[in-house]
A protein has these predicted regions:
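Long, contiguous binding/interaction regions
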Residues: 1-59, 104-110, 117-121, 127-130, ...
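A glycine-rich, hydrophobic loop/mini-helix early in the fold
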Residues: 56-76
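A broadly conserved sequence feature marking short terminus-proximal activation segments
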Residues: 75-126
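Charged phosphate-binding loop/patch that engages nucleotide di/tri-phosphates or the phosphate backbone
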Residues: 168-179
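Intrinsically disordered, low-complexity segments enriched in serine/proline and basic residues
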Residues: 185, 198-199, 219-223
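Aromatic (phenylalanine/tyrosine) cluster motif
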Residues: 188, 213-215, 223-226
Length: 231
């Protein structure tokens, strides 16, 4: 059964997170990302939530890698009170906030991500500094802060929607990853040389209508098929 956290546990976790943020800022004097998940209800971590968190890390790290941004420091914790990751970066805060906001707004799963960006002085970078609208509610799409403040939606509604978003994103990602591996296996196989009678890097073997290039084209075209098979 999933652990249900108490108010005291959550307050302690929040205090420890704030303390850790302060220590990192004092040590590095750099832009810092604090990544957590927006999870309603008393269950803040389980295998499904952890997978969603890992997908968020993957998206963030892929985006930073594409921009050749390498963290000065990284740490992660996975407790019953939730998952946390800290990235210390020698980059301009607004640039980093643009990256994290794009991830938060770029998919349904991103609505569960809370990627705070802190300046070297500890001040949080606000979305409005980039001209972005406030984050929207998981249920109705209106302002998340307004819905939270007025408690329009029940915890059960939010939990159901959260679980739905996590499952959909994980299934989609797993299907795509499996399809990529299947395509890679086909390409590795055709590149294995020599293979008497079969298509390889130097000849077409007994095949009159295929060479390595047509094989690669055919393999690439199979991605949607493999993806559908996994689903």
């Amino acid at each position: 059964m999933d652990h249900q956290v108490t108010l005291t546990e959550m307050l302690d976790a929040r205090e420890k997170r704030a303390f850790r943020q302060q220590k990192l800022l004092e040590k590095y004097h750099c832009t810092t990302i604090c990544f957590t998940m927006n999870i309603a209800g008393p269950v803040k971590n389980n295998p499904l939530i952890l997978r969603g968190f890992q997908l968020g890390k993957r998206l963030l790290e892929e985006r930073m890698g594409a921009l050749k941004i390498k963290p000065i420091y990284f740490e992660e914790s996975n407790e019953v009170t939730g998952n946390e990751a800290f990235y210390v970066l020698d980059r301009e805060p607004l640039m980093i906030k643009r990256i994290t906001s794009d991830i938060e707004d770029g998919s349904d799963l991103g609505r569960l991500f809370d990627m705070d960006v802190l300046r070297a002085d500890g001040q949080k970078v606000d979305r409005t500094e980039l001209g972005l609208r406030p984050r929207s509610c998981l249920i109705c799409g209106k302002s998340a802060k307004e819905c939270s403040r007025s408690r329009i939606h029940s915890v059960l509604e939010l939990q159901h929607r959260t679980k739905q978003l996590l499952i959909e994103a994980i299934e989609e990602t797993d299907a795509q990853d499996a399809a990529k591996l299947a395509i890679r296996a086909l390409l590795y196989e055709v590149c294995t040389t020599p293979k008497p009678g079969l298509v390889d890097c130097v000849n077409s073997g007994s095949h009159k209508d295929m060479d390595i290039f047509t094989f690669m084209n055919s393999a690439s075209a199979l991605f949607p098929y493999f993806e559908t098979c996994v689903k």
